[in-house]
Regions:
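Surface-exposed, charge/polar-rich loops and edge strands
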Residues: 1-334
Length: 334
């Protein structure tokens, strides 16, 4: 299967640079993957689409201020993007320093925090901090906005690039389908009799990386940490599962495939994948050729989803992290 099959034309002005004025003010495109029917809705209408047979699964990961401005000991500028903390003072990170730093290279963050490169770890670097990483990120870190958002991170982003139910620090990108929810909307859904459950999948830096292969099947998926508590597993039994975001879906389907309720997920979902847990998917509009778009196409069928995207472009929906959302009913044919 060619990666080019998941391309589409998107006018740049449809890439949302800021969130909607209110979280629930976004639009919602409802796609029935079985019939192909499309409906243009508002996100605030979501509660009327759920009922007492449903379990809504949220990803409660919390975005950390992972982007650090740094300087070389020679005085040049650099950037350290912390992908994950390994312990209190060691991390895996992306480095932007003009050239690939070698083991032993030193960088300075803020008022004198030293960061020393210890070596490579695939596409990342293992680095050591002279102070606890959590405190360094809180004092000097910036919200790691996606590269297609042109403005520097501001106070608005610290609030709006975070879900209202975020609890477990560890993500370097938001699970964006959840950005549309308010606590009041969640309670309205609960009032319909739906169960609300949580998983944790810490979105990694790989979510920003393009697919570089020509064939879909040759792409190597990045690894992300996930955990599913026993209460969530219990809440799935005998119910229709609505996954809020591709990350929630990947955590649930990884658990079903491996039998492990916690660990590392490298699950790559593309057309042909057999879903065993999730019945409905709430997700934003994704980049052309991305693994996230491939997942959506696997769930709702490629023809249906790409037709829905063409409709969204015509109707001037807002795209990507700060954009509008889709609710996809799983395609059960094929």
């Amino acid at each position: 299967m060619l990666v080019s099959e998941f391309d589409y034309e998107l006018p740049s002005e449809l890439i949302a640079q800021h969130p909607a004025p209110q979280r629930t003010a976004s639009r919602l495109l409802h796609l029935d993957g079985r019939s192909g029917e499309l409906r243009d809705l508002r996100f605030s209408e979501l509660p009327r689409l759920v009922g007492s047979a449903d379990t809504l699964v949220l990803n409660d990961t919390r975005v950390v201020k992972a982007r650090l401005a740094a300087r070389k000991t020679s005085g040049g500028k650099a950037e350290i993007f912390v992908e994950r903390a390994l312990d209190a003072r060691h991390a895996l990170a992306m480095m932007r320093a003009g050239h690939s730093p070698k083991a032993g290279a030193k960088f300075i963050v803020g008022d004198g925090v030293q960061v020393i490169v210890e070596g490579r770890a695939d596409d990342l670097y293992r680095v050591a901090f002279s102070e606890d990483i959590e405190g360094v990120l809180e004092r000097f870190g910036a919200v790691p906005l996606p590269p297609y958002i042109a403005h520097p991170a501001a106070a608005e982003d610290a609030e709006r690039y975070q879900t209202v139910y975020a609890a477990a620090p560890g993500a370097v990108a938001a699970p964006t389908a959840g950005l549309h929810f308010t606590k009041a909307l969640i309670e309205e859904i609960r009032g319909k009799g739906a169960a609300i459950a949580a998983v944790t999948l810490h979105v990694g830096v790989g979510t920003f990386q393009p697919v570089r292969t020509e064939q879909v099947e040759e792409h190597r998926m990045h690894s992300e940490r996930y955990a599913i508590p026993p209460a969530t597993i219990a809440a799935l039994a005998g119910r229709k599962v609505l996954a809020v975001g591709t990350t929630s879906l990947r955590a649930l389907e990884t658990w079903k495939l491996t039998g492990k309720s916690a660990g590392e997920s490298e699950l790559f979902v593309y057309p042909g994948f057999r879903f065993q847990v999730v019945d409905r998917l709430l997700t934003n509009f994704h980049l052309p050729r991305s693994t996230l778009l491939m997942l959506a196409c696997a769930f709702g069928s490629k023809d249906n989803v790409l037709r829905a995207y063409a409709h969204a472009v015509r109707e001037r929906y807002r795209f990507f992290s700060y954009g509008d959302a889709m609710l996809i009913e799983r395609c059960t044919s094929g």
